[in-house]
Structures are given as structure tokens and as C-alpha cells.
Amino acid sequence: MDIFILALAILPVIVLLIYIYKQDKYEKEPVRMLALAFLLGILSIPLTLFLDGVIDVMIGGTSVFYVAFFQAGIPEEFAKWVLFMLVIWRNKNFDEFFDGIVYMSFIGLGFACVENIMYVFGEQELLSSL
């Protein structure tokens, strides 16, 4: 049963990764770089949790707006963007406008894959801060 649930959590990510890869019609990105981008999405989670803690200490709040915007949106997207800028931005393979969509999608899907797994296996405490 756990394998089936895990597959349900990961399958949408795999489908989207393949779809996005196929959309890059002119100059496909190296699979190694795409795997790195996916890994960066996974690695953005600790940075997200750190940023969430900093924002919570600095601002604090419990409203739906606060949680959605300051505890989820800003830390998550900023963490993904920072890793993109540090690792992918200056890479020689990043040479077309569409590459930004491809790489950021892979980063986002790396994050989403872990988030999906955490949702289906009930890691509520950690999830509440993502």
C-alpha cells in the first residue's frame, strides 16, 4: 500500500518533468543539468524552513493571509530563486529564454515532489511550515 501511495505522490511530478523536457524543442538541456535543477528544488526545502523561521520571528502572525504569503509564498519561492541564481544562472547551458522556464520548472518540481510525499505520509508539522 505504501508503494502505491508513494507512486501516486511521485507520478504527477514525473509526468510534468517529461512534458516540460519535451517542450524544449530547439536545444534540449543536458539531463545532468536537469537532474541538478531537480535536486536544487529538494535542497531548497531546508533553506525554506530557515527563511520561514526568520520571517516568523521578525513578523509573526496567524492570519490566513500571513501564513499563505509570508510563511509559504515568500520563503519557498525565494529559496528556489536563490539556488537557481547561484547554480544555474551562469551555467553555459543556460543560453535561451525558454531555459529559464525549463530549469525553474525542474527546481519547482523537485520541491513539489518532496512536498507531495510529505503530504501523503502525513508529515503535518513539517508541512505546515512549507
Positions of predicted regions on the chain:
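Hydrophobic alpha-helical segments at protein termini of multi-pass membrane proteins
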Residues: 1-130
